[in-house]
Amino acid sequence: MTSKIAQNLKQPALDFLSFVNASPTPFHAVQSAKELLSKAGFQEIKEKDSWSSTCRPGGKYYLTRNSSTIVAFAIGKKWKPGNPISMIGAHTDSPVLRIKPVSNKRGEGFVQVGVETYGGGIWHTWFDRDLGVAGRAMVRTGDGSIVQKLVKIDRPILRIPTLAIHLDRQETFAFNKETQLFPIAGLVAAELNRTADSTATGEKTAANNETEKGDFAPLKSVTERHHPYLVELIAAEAGVKPDDILDFEMILFDTQKSCLGGLLEEFVFSPRLDNLNSSFCATVGLIDSVADASALDDEPSIRLIALFDHEEIGSRTAQGADSNVLPAIIRRLSVLPSSTSGNEDLATAFEETLSTSFLLSADMAHAVHPNYAAKYENDHRPEINKGPVIKINANARYATNSPGIVLLQEVARKAAEDGGEGVPLQLFVVRNDSSCGSTIGPMLSAALGARTLDLGNPQLSMHSIRETGGTYDVGHSIRLFTSFFKHYSNTSKTIFVD
């Protein structure tokens, strides 16, 4: 393999590194996706507005909910009400430590920050890491309106230190998540000196900048609930004054950047592979499928991606996959008029669209681990850089079935028509004596009644603060998703079930 070819094959992974490094939270991930979509000519619309005069065949659009879930779609120029929608679903969240509503803690001379666990993280991997803070802050502007500001303190201000081995000889690393998972942020003495110096010089800090009006406050101020200096850092990142911050949602993240690794840079070492890897590939796959100016000219379908928040905690929120986000959007899209609209029957357009649509539920899969090979079923051991993994479970923990597998094989084969080679695929089932995870596929297939298949790129160390994936699998998924969008309309007509 020449260096030029190798570099081209690695480029999608390098682009992913930029995406994931810029996206420590779902809010940032949605912002990163918006930037990619806007650059590709997608127009932002609002869920609260009417789309009847906005969305037209040939158009490309995106919308957000809670700024942590994003849906983007491109409408074929030959669209008619009741036609199919080819969909890819993924999620923007990952297991993290989130700052508690009241986080101001001190212990044994240390300034500490109270955090709570979000999702099922491998929490021992968060010890002894250089942690920054990111999220969104709600701030009051000069005209009195309240807006959100994204914050990313991209330097190590927090750390959760482990106990020295000399003080704990246990073979297993056990700890209490409520009492022993609090990061240190500094020393009390240093904080007191900083506050004293600021007061002596007449500077206002967040601690002594309380309101002078004596207004009733339903809650304690942000600077009372959190360390004043932390609030000052958040305010500085948001470009506002500390007393303009009304509340915030902040998480911790590893400040070590994602990178390529391995002897031949065949690995991606990164946080949040689960599931920003799938979110990135879905976004780029949609963009690439409409990159040609004539891409939608003969397209009778809508091409759509939905990147949901809160998958790691069950999806049962207003912006989760188990909400009305996707059904509501599909209902509105199903009745959009065609470019030659006439007397179209819209009464059953929604049901017609669902019955002919298809959803790829894209969430990361487990690659075989060389040190724990016995944990995997003998004949189903996905390998890194061998392509996306089709996930199957007899008890419907995944939504995959045979018609979907046949469709995906055709899509993977047709990827060669767009240049390059076809996309390799793998199969995965868990052992009978092992529990099986799940994702958004089953809940969406049940809610929509649409055909669904679960798949994802293989990775190691899922839910660790730092995970391992394949460099070339990023490109594999992008090409598969691009081919899915390009060829679904014609391919689906050749597979008969109902």
UniProtKB/Swiss-Prot annotation:
One of its GO terms (cellular component) is fungal-type vacuole. GO terms for molecular function: metalloaminopeptidase activity; zinc ion binding. Optimum temperature is 50 degrees Celsius. This is Aspartyl aminopeptidase. Inhibited by zinc. Stimulated by calcium and bacitracin. Coiled coil: none annotated. GO terms for biological process: proteolysis. Its EC number is 3.4.11.21. Pfam families: Peptidase_M18 (PF02127). It catalyses: Release of an N-terminal aspartate or glutamate from a peptide, with a preference for aspartate. PANTHER family: ASPARTYL AMINOPEPTIDASE (PTHR28570:SF3). Keywords: Aminopeptidase, Hydrolase, Metal-binding, Metalloprotease, Protease, Zinc. Optimum pH is 7.5. Belongs to the peptidase M18 family. CDD domains: M18_DAP. Its cofactor is Zn(2+). SUPFAM superfamilies: Aminopeptidase/glucanase lid domain, Zn-dependent exopeptidases. The N-terminus is blocked. Binds 2 Zn(2+) ions per subunit. Zn(2+) 2 binds at D274, E312, H463. Substrate binds at H166, E311, D363, H366, K391, Y398. The keyword S-adenosyl-L-methionine does not apply. Zn(2+) 1 binds at H91, D274, D363. Tetrahedron-shaped homododecamer built from six homodimers.
